[in-house]
Structures are given as structure tokens and as C-alpha cells.
Amino acid sequence: MLVYLVLCALGEVASWFPISTTVAGHAQRCCDPALGFTLGWIYWLKFIVITPNQLTAAALVASYWVDAETLNPGIWFTIFLTFILSGYKIVVVLGLLILSLVLALGGGPDHERKGFRYWKNQGAFAGEQTPIGRLRAICRTMPSATFTYSGSELIGVTILHSHNPRRGAARAIQLTFYRILVLNLVGTVLLGMLVPYNLDDLANTSRDKVTTASTFVVAVQGAHAAVLLHFLNASLLLFVLSSANQALWVATRILHGLAVDHNAPAILLQTGSTGTPIVALGGCAVLSSLAYLNISGDSRTLFDQFINMSTMFSLLAWISILVTHLAFIRARRAQRVPDKALAFKAPLGAFGSAIALVFCVLIIVSRSFDIVDPGASIRRFDYIAFLTSYLAIPLYVCLIAGYKGFTRCASVSPSEADLGYPNHFFSSRP
């Protein structure tokens, strides 16, 4: 629901402005130039962290074949960065969903119909007996759950490049919502049917190669479908490599856009003969080499740290999008822009964005429940998790305060927001 509300808020604003306007540009026009500046950089940081995160995930998947002690993860990254992979992901995931359903119904080599036995025998909160323990269990899943949906707001790019923004916004949001519903939620349900929570292969606490495998690989192995294991692991490896490639592309585009808007050094504007922003791409690629930290550290630990950072950047980006939408609504009302002039209108309007803002704040606060464990015999404080989870917040505040202090800019008044009305941006578009 949170993701849907964010998508609707973005869809309403993005479908109003012209193609050349970015998400950061929306914030500059409707809310505050400092927020637009900050959103651009936070958005770039989010995707520049996702790239090494996905490369780290690739190392974890590849460790199923060759342990890190035998072949250093740094070797894998040198190989992976030579690939440009995309387009196959939907086919792979749909195949995994069908395979999982067949295995759950007893169609695997073991002919064991698992059904919902793990939902009944162990349950959703197995091992947690107290309300506080169950709350902590929910909070513990928030970073990875939020990370799963991060990037959903990229539909804004689709809307901005649509010839018919009214139709394009609604269709893009619907397709994204259905993708989340089918691929993410259905996949989670099926995995819950196939894999018990306390399976040793999921612990990832030893150096046995099975513990570094994907949950889907563990599910297939549990059904004794050995012939599919290596093929499935290879498919998942290509999956995360494609995600890393996409994140690198988005980060490069955002960084170049920041330079175009004079919010980043002008050297980033340099392009090659084909129009590729080579300096921005090179800078992002260099930062992606953070994945080589696996050479001196545990891949699983580093993977979790990247998720913590990316999750917080995503939440801050969502908060900025929602604040921009609320400012856009205030500006429309102040300038008396009728609803019928909108290319797309968020179904729940300002109320939906306000509710989504509350949920974003709650998710941010909930992270502290897992960082500090007051119920342990020895009070545990994971300072690394704290830093990687919350470092983005002071950075976010410093970017806003620094931009305001340097430029002396003021927040945009609703009556003075540049909405371009009554000369509607799309009045001349087909």
C-alpha cells in the first residue's frame, strides 16, 4: 500500500510537468529548491549503493559453486563488470513462480505435497513468544522489504516520456502495482510454503557453500530436484547482474542530470561521440568498486550494510516525493487549477500522501528495534548497523541546510509555484 501511494503521488506530479523535468525538478518548482537539490543527490546515492550491493549479491550466489576461500569475490566482480545483461528477468521470475507452485503441490522428484504445513506447524512468528519479540521480528524484516520495492518510482521516467501522459501515468502505475502483487507477493507466499524458517541452509552462518545459496535454490534442493540447482543458480546470478547494470545506468543518468541542472560539477557534462556521459559513467563505475570490500570482509555482512544504506536513501526519496506531491496540491488549490486539468490524479489525494508519510517515518523509527536488543542478557548495540542505517538522515539534513545557506533560497509559495497553468504543458501534445 505504501508503494502504491508513493507511485500515485509521483504519477500525479510527473504527468503534469514536461518531459525535460526530473523528479528533483518537481520539488524545485513546487516546494523548495533546496529539497530538489537534496532529492537529486539522495536519489543518486541510493542507486550508487545498489550497484555494489547487487554485485555483492552476485558474489553470494556465485559462492554456491566456489567458496570465497577458494576464489576471492574480487575475481567475480572483474568478470561480472564485463557483462551487460537485461530483458530476461521477467521470464526467469515467472519460471521460478511456476516451479515453486509445482513443488508446493507435490510435482517435484520427492512427490511431497507441502501445501501450507509450515504456515500451521511453525507459523508466521515461530520462535517469538512475546508481543515485543513479534514486533522486533517485523521490524527486522523492514530493511530488506523496503529494499525490494526501492526503484518502483522509476515509473516517473516512463510517464515523462509518454506521448499521452494521462493514459501513460495510469497504465504505468497499474503495471507496476501488478508486478509487485504477482512477482513479489506471490513469490513470498510460495517460498513460505516450501522453506521452513529454521532450515540450516538459510542461516548463512557457516562457510558451507549451501548456506550462501538463494532461497529459491534452497527450496529446489529441499525437493531433491538436483538437476535444476546449477541452472537456477546461474539464472539468479544473471538476475542480480542485470539489476547491478540497471542501477549503474540510473546512477549515471541522475549524476549527469545534476550537472545539467548546475547542481554538480560541470565536468560531468562531458559526453562521448555517441552521447554517453563518459565522466559521469566513469565516476559511478569507480564508486561501484566498493563491492571489492568483499575481499577483506564477509559478503553477507557487507550485503546487509548496503541494504541498510539503500533502504534509508529510498525512504528519504519517498518522503521527498510525498512532500512534493503535497506542495503540488497546495499550489494547485492556490492557483485554482481544476482537477479536470490533471493528466492523472492520485485516487486518495493529499490524504494518501499524508498516510504514506506517516508509514515512512514509522519504518525509519522501527529500524532501531533491531539495532538495540534490551531483552538480551548482555545489552547489544550494533553500531555498524546504526551507522549504515541512519547516516543518510544527517546527510539529508546537511544537504538541505547547506544548499539553503549557500544560495539563500526560500521555500516556494503555493501561489508562486511554476505550474505553467493555464498554458497547460501538454496542450500541444498528441
List the model feature ranges, each with a label:
Residues 3-80, 244-254, 316:
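Hydrophobic transmembrane alpha-helices that form the core helical bundles
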